[in-house]
Amino acid sequence: MSIDINWDTLTGGADGAARAETIRAFIHDKFQQVTLPKFIRSVHVHSFDFGSASPEIEIKDICDPLPDFYEEDEDYPDNEDDDDDEAGLDSNPRNKCITRKGTNFKSVAISLVARQFETSHQSALTPGIPGGTSNINYFHLPLSAGLSGATTPLAAVAGAQLQGWLDNPYGRPSTPTNMRRLRHAASFNSLTLTPQSHPDPSSRPSSRHQHDDERRRSLAESDDASSQHGYDRTPSVSPHPMREKSPEDIQVVAHVQYSGDIKMSLTAEILLDYPMQSFVGIPLKLNITGLTFDGVALLAYIKRRAHFCFLSPDDAEALVGSDAGFNGLQTDSNGENAQPVQRPKIGGLLENIRVESEIGGQGSGKQVLKNVGKVESFVLEQVRRIFEDEFVYPSFWTFLV
């Protein structure tokens, strides 16, 4: 299902200018936090314009929100929303926007595996459905049809990384939010820590191994005793408060494509090291004149909050499938040497950024500075990094509506 966007209404007028200025200031502030290379003194963002082309949006699925969207935000609790309701319509909800960093991908995948374990146990006795109903309502996608809850795409990714990550003490998260993701995995692994308390007499070990078995048994019993007195080897962490789920909660999965004339103007001051180090700074103006974007977006509405983010290319391909495939033949200038052309994968995010540079002496066609190419590459890389750090899951934006 596709939808039309009134791009002029969103980007035009006073409201559109205010949105453009908000984006400009946001990108400018992010550049001030970046560690610059030695040949760049500063970077300033001067303007941002949405352009005239609108993105193409295709709704892929409507499903339940991700678990991370239910985490309680200490800065904006639910009771504050109730206070806003009582205060009337004086407050402007458009000004209330929160950016939040979720857990890393590994712990999110473990959370999805644990969630599917719970669902598979609850639906194991459902008659007439092979494999149970654990994959029903799992993003409601055709890709998950016929798969059990443990073999859905993200679960397969999580299972491949689960064992090695749990065995690595340096890879375990230390925050309470991340530790909450491990509670199910720890409960499953703990089943193998305690030996059998009453072994079969026919399988009793020989005398030379009996001492080692008794020693291991005593160590296990001491661990159990320590756990009963509150000295469990797994640190107990209070669970992160979660909002109550509601049947009205909804999440939209959409494929977003954009190839337009979005514009942004930046200035980078290049330092000259001749005749001495940092002798003088020359401004280099970079004009981004357009970009090509392909991504999968999540938009969830929970109570009075709207959560928005994009998915990484791997997650996007796992959730909505891949459009990669044969896309015809391409020949050279002579019409020979036909080569197959592959369609790009879905969810590649920022695929191309068009940029023009302006510096003194450009009109004469001479190369003024050899670092111009390096500056362009650095600025474009930072633009990509800012986008991925702020808008790609597990990072997401929350709007109070």
Curated annotation (Swiss-Prot):
Where is there biased composition of kind Acidic residues?
70-88
Q: How does the protein associate with the membrane?
A: Peripheral membrane protein
Keyword annotations from UniProtKB, A to Z: Endoplasmic reticulum, Lipid transport, Lipid-binding, Membrane, Mitochondrion, Mitochondrion outer membrane, Transport
Q: Which residues form the SMP-LTD domain?
A: 1-401
Q: Can the keyword Transmembrane be found in this entry's annotation?
A: no
Where in the sequence does UniProt note compositional bias of the Basic and acidic residues kind? 209-220
- Where does it mainly reside? mitochondrion
What compartments host this protein? Mitochondrion outer membrane; Endoplasmic reticulum membrane
What top-level branch of life does the organism fall under? Eukaryota
- One annotated GO biological process: protein insertion into mitochondrial outer membrane
> Which intervals of the chain are annotated as region Disordered?
70-95, 190-247
Please give the subunit comment from the record. Component of the ER-mitochondria encounter structure (ERMES) or MDM complex, composed of MMM1, MDM10, MDM12 and MDM34. A MMM1 homodimer associates with one molecule of MDM12 on each side in a pairwise head-to-tail manner, and the SMP-LTD domains of MMM1 and MDM12 generate a continuous hydrophobic tunnel for phospholipid trafficking.
In which family does this protein belong, per the annotation? Belongs to the MDM12 family.
The protein's job, in short, is: Component of the ERMES/MDM complex, which serves as a molecular tether to connect the endoplasmic reticulum (ER) and mitochondria. Components of this complex are involved in the control of mitochondrial shape and protein biogenesis, and function in nonvesicular lipid trafficking between the ER and mitochondria. MDM12 is required for the interaction of the ER-resident membrane protein MMM1 and the outer mitochondrial membrane-resident beta-barrel protein MDM10.
> What is recorded about the protein's domains?
The SMP-LTD domain is a barrel-like domain that can bind various types of glycerophospholipids in its interior and mediate their transfer between two adjacent bilayers.
Name assigned to this protein: Mitochondrial distribution and morphology protein 12
